Amino acid sequence: MDVFKQSEVWFVIGSQNLYGPKTLQQVMDNAHQVVNSLNSEAGLPVKLVLKPLVTTPDEITALCREANYDTACIGIMTWLHTFSPAKMWIGGLSILNKPLLQFHTQFNAQIPWETMDMDFMNLNQTAHGGREFGFIGARMRQQHSVITGHWQDKEAHQRIGQWMRVAAAKQESQQLKVARFGDNMREVAVTEGDKVAAQIQFGYSVNAYGIGDLVAVVDAVSKGDIDTLVEEYEATYRFTDAVKLNGDKRENLLDAARIELGMTRFLEQGGFKAFTTNFENLYGLKQLPGLAVQRLMQQGYGFGGEGDWKTAALLRILKVMGTGLKGGTSFMEDYTYNFQPGNDLVVGSHMLEVCPSIAKEEKPLLDVQHLGIGGKADPARLIFSTPAGPALNASLIDMGNRFRLLVNVVDTVEQPHPLPKLPVARAIWQAQPSLATAAEAWIIAGGAHHTVFSQAVGVDELRLYAEMHGIEFLLIDNDTTLPAFKNEIRWNEVYYQLNR
């Protein structure tokens, strides 16, 4: 999945004509060097494109208008090399609907103490030019990010890369289509929500399809295509005897391959990048889609069980953010606890649908086993564990007057004991700051039982994503205390009531 190849961020230098052509030419010469260096040496996920210098209100407004309508542009990165009076930016910023990053840098890293004169001071005015630009952003109550540091600094590179990933995720959010196969699991509350409000807030659309619409595509899959896909399975995974050729569950595997091919075609034909299923809506399917869902997630699709469209969309967004990074991202559910002094653990899993991108094993085990829910034939699934390391769980919930993005930082651990009778993929973690505090804070905040689990994407990216969309962000980590957490929720309640 290469979602960044066709994207670009526009690098924009603001100034004014009173500096004269010689100074302005030096500004652009420096800008060319900065952009070329960032593109070639900073490891950025998205290409920077240097735009012509803007020195008038009309030029700025025209550039912002062009950015809005250019589908390749996912955001604007500004640098105030000199002083650019910020009233010139009001018209452009008032219509800009792409993410905005102010790179508060300067061409020279250190002050040339021996030679610095007023010409040098006149040219290198980021220190106060950036403050003028920052004021108008604050005055207009506009969300924009600020990164301070020299353009050759590795930390600045890393933060710019993070911002680019989130900007790309916002672009994806605005064009994302989510398909729901069936409806919500009956009587479940947290997987419901206002889909119209979500489309207004995030841009993505959510529409339901009768299971018969999917079944028609599944039934049209040819035997030849099934055989080809099963050959891919055999090359990619370890098989139990039951699913090998002539095994007693081989037919179930073939049915699973048919379902995968049908689901893939349905999603591709409709332009969907996320979807949900529901074990209560399976009429016409021989088994609950398990293997199909796992493999589609690994290809970058978002997924939510039991009709959970918010988690499906969020998973797709994190898949985009994490493209090319080490570690995977998966649909997840807190399933059961290990209460043990000094070793409290959470086992995360689901009935079947855990993404192999988080698998520790190079070749997960493919098996068919009984599933005592859904009333269908035994489904195929991939079974694996998850490597140790830092991770997070994220949940997007509808609070009625706002959306809340809740994140818990966790530490994934190696599976401490064999699980010979557990026929599903799983991750095991220690919640920060402790199981007790994390669980209580999560429950108090109304966090869902479904989450997006990621070992690729970090807290900073998710906080920035929430800021870009103007939604609430709550973090549970090693610094969390319940009294402070409860107070934050109370303060947020007041803020979002006043900010409606």
From Swiss-Prot:
Enzyme Commission number(s) from the entry: 5.3.1.4
Keywords (A to Z) from UniProt: Arabinose catabolism, Carbohydrate metabolism, Isomerase, Manganese, Metal-binding
Any one GO MF annotation of this record: manganese ion binding
An example Gene Ontology biological process: L-arabinose catabolic process to xylulose 5-phosphate
Protein's UniProt keywords contain Cytoplasm: no
Record CDD domains: L-arabinose_isomerase
InterPro entries: Ara_Isoase_C, AraA_central, AraA_N, AraA_N_sf, Fuc/Ara_isomerase_C, Fucose_isomerase_N/cen_sf, Lara_isomerase
Transmembrane segments: none
Disulfide-bond pairs as recorded: none
Enzymatic reactions: beta-L-arabinopyranose = L-ribulose
Residues holding Mn(2+): E306, E333, H350, H450
Domain of life per record: Bacteria
Top-rank EC class of the record's enzyme: isomerase
Pfam families xrefs: AraA_central, AraA_N, Arabinose_Iso_C
GO cellular component: cytosol
Recorded family membership: Belongs to the arabinose isomerase family.
HAMAP family: Arabinose_Isome
Subunit structure: Homohexamer.
Role of this protein: Catalyzes the conversion of L-arabinose to L-ribulose.
Protein name: L-arabinose isomerase
Organism: Yersinia pseudotuberculosis serotype IB (strain PB1/+)
